[in-house]
Amino acid sequence: MRFIPRERAAQTIGPCNVKIQAPVGFVTGCHAGDKFMVQATLASMKHFCPTIPICLVVDGTFDVSDLESEYELIVLRVSELPSKEMRKLMSGNGRAKLAAMWEGPFEFYVWADSDAIVWGDFTQAVRTDVDFQVFWSEISIPADATEVPPWLPHFYFDPQKLSRFDPEFDWRGNAYFSSGAFACRREVVPFDKWMEAESWANETPGLFGDFYEQPLLNYFVHSMTQRGEIKSAMTNLQDVWRHHGFDELKQDCADSNWHFPKTIRRPRVAHFCGRKPLLFDWQAYSRPFTIARLEHHRRQHGELGAWLAVLNEERRVWAGKFQRRLQRAIGKWK
């Protein structure tokens, strides 16, 4: 189904009377330390899908008025959520992205982390006819598996411990995805249901992996689908280079001269999770993300100014890393 925003009057729905400002949109988010990265995410969204409205979830009190103006953002601050319980759950951690699920401005949205970029216009492939669209490439565990792979309890959940709370859930035959990119309907997982699972985790150490919202989101999507509570689908729309490789991305960038390529062979979300996609980190593949960072700065500073801005960002990041390492070393000597 074509992912097209339609003009409509704002409507009020949900328990907290949040106004829905568009039927569909992009959502991303950041804390203060990731602002320099989310600029690239926003630039990629605006470049490849200029008509799609964007919401920015902000975890903290830092200023984002420059981004709000540049990209015509709808800003959703975690600190301003009407529910104290929501604020406590989301503040200062990766669960901040859940603000869009319960208090966001779109009926249906595509989420991308601040270390991810839109890589081509993939809106033709977004399924607004389902409740949740998994952005992943394969079924992770065969339906007839007899052993639990060690990565499942590490990244997601321990099936044996989970069976105490949901004995009918089948952990096999599912696509376990990175929650750095997905699409879903607003309130696809009710808040009270989510908090119930959080209480399971509090009373059962090791039930869910230590990856913020990712373990619970995967559990809910697959368990609710199995029970027929939601309709979900899987589409190959998220590229994690450490998992999928980066040959396609390198081919796309080959003749782009540090600009967004005019032709993207396979549009999707390119997700640079793990090591931050810094220009001078030789252990991280970062060229597409650097292109998006440059695109953001070119909007204000031109070519030379864009490069200088990126280099200055890198200087601040590496200086911060050095300072933290030095402080840790001094702490060990004391």
Protein language model features and the residues they cover:
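A glycosyltransferase accessory/donor-loop signature
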Residues: 1-23, 169-173, 186-334
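A conserved hydrophobic helix/loop-capping motif in glycosyltransferases and polysaccharide synthases
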Residues: 25-31
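Conserved glycosyltransferase catalytic-site signature
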Residues: 38, 94, 98, 116, ...
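Short, acidic, metal-binding catalytic loop of nucleotide-sugar glycosyltransferases
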Residues: 44-52
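Short internal beta-strands
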Residues: 54-59
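Active-site-proximal specificity loops/subdomain of glycosyltransferases
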Residues: 62-104
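GT-A fold catalytic core of metal-dependent nucleotide-sugar glycosyltransferases
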Residues: 98-149
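Conserved catalytic core of nucleotide-sugar-dependent glycosyltransferases
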Residues: 128-192, 196
